[in-house]
Amino acid sequence: LASIARGLLTPAKAQPAPFDRSIVRQMAREAASKPFKAPDNKLPDNLKDLDYDHYRAIRFSPDRALWHGEKLPFEVQFFHRGFFYANRVDIYEVANGQATKIAYQPEYFSFGDNAPPKAGVDLGFAGFRLHTPINRPDYHDEICVFLGASYFRAVAKGELYGLSARGLSINTGQAKGEEFPFFKTFWIEKPGANATSIVVHALLDSESAAAAYRFTIRPGDTTVLDVEMAVYPRVELDHVGLAPMTSMFFFGPNDRNDVDDFRPSVHDSDGLAIFNGRGEELWRPLHNPKDLQISTFSDLNPHGFGLMQRQKNFFAYQDLESGFERRPSLWAEPIGDWGDGSVQLIEIPTKEEVHDNIAVFWKPKTALQAKGEHTYTYRLHWGPDAPKPSALARFSRTGVGAKGEDSKIFVLDLVGEKLKSIDPKSVRGVVSAEKAKVQNIVSQPNPATGGWRLSFELSVKEKVPVELRASLVQGADAISEVWVYRWTP
């Protein structure tokens, strides 16, 4: 009787079919050889026009989770379609080399004030989330979610959701308009009883390309996603983004943007970090511009890049509900040579914190040719910092303020073990600017942080953007990463 009851509580399944990773690539290859077919987004009348609050009222029942009660390290819960998430997503369980489709049942969900769909209607799902005991051994925490277009996000131990990653970006920041690829099918491999990772396969489609993915997800103090992807363009892709990520920067000490708010900062990420192929480490603080801005960091075979949340102190935010200090950083580590290209940073004006206004991705220099196969492998690290903390001092805070007419003062704080024992007399700040005058450069220990403070004044006569670079050096040797910034009048 117990086994029968458990069967009634777990998701219904269809007939199995053989599966291996090559099948997803073959499906993507075949899809790209045919005209694009728009996704199924048809919903019953009572679901297609849901607002945010009514959609939130539809909740998955945890006791219906895939593998619930089987004493496995992972469980899967599903999202209902509706609101922004109208597209149908099909999800399969893979076990013993067989893929079995998870059939939609309205009984998996509670609908609040919403009328449930009619029985027997197969709506599919909008997406899913993975649960595992990451914070304590007796509770399956949510650690990763795939929901909406090709968006996904994850958290490490003790963290809250923040920025998102995407499977692929196309024409982001281009005048002709962005194209949003979407995951249409997932295959989730059933883990063993002692598994520390879980594997998810995905099929992506879009007007311009199809793609196949294999994600290996390893939760922990840093949650790591190994991503293997193969892209099959229908047309030449000259503005494609690899390892794309999306975040929010509303305001901070470098850019309050005329916001009247009791909080000192509001952001999911405060800067872009790059470890380029030349071995140079860059830090670019984010800002909320008045107009769309695109920054290009040309490179050859980058070691990594990511959107960081370096401010981990509650007092930097003063927000009891949002917990910005617990939002993760996201670092993308290419595996193998990615060749010529650039890290692209796109900053979009926003007047509200609810909008993601920051995009970062790797743009290959050479367009991806139609009818070909283009493969990439990379590793995404979700956690408190980049996976391999640098020996160089790093910039932890950027403050900007007025300093008389046509002048600004920049105050940059740095932290790092090396700074605690260095001879202050041997350290100097190096600052350069295009189309502006830099003066009063001061570098000194910061006893409040145990680090260092570099400050300077910038005089600007022309109302044009100014590109800035700053670092700390000891003799001819760099002892900090390089701070780069675009100041816009």
Language-model segments: which ranges?
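Short, hydrophobic/aromatic beta-strand segments
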Residues: 102-103, 211, 237-244, 318, ...
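Terminal accessory/anchoring regions of large secretory-pathway or extracellular enzymes
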Residues: 15-52, 58-61, 79, 316-317, ...
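N-terminal export signals
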Residues: 1-14
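Extended, loop-rich substrate-binding clefts of extracytoplasmic carbohydrate-active enzymes
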Residues: 157, 162-220, 339-347, 351, ...
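A contiguous, surface-exposed recognition patch within enzymatic or periplasmic domains that forms
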Residues: 51-53, 145-147, 238, 242-373, ...
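A mature extracytoplasmic/lumenal domain signature
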Residues: 95, 106, 202-204, 219, ...
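Solvent-exposed N-terminal domain segments of exported/luminal and surface proteins
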Residues: 29, 33-176
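Acidic, contiguous internal or C-terminal segments within carbohydrate-active enzymes
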Residues: 202-251
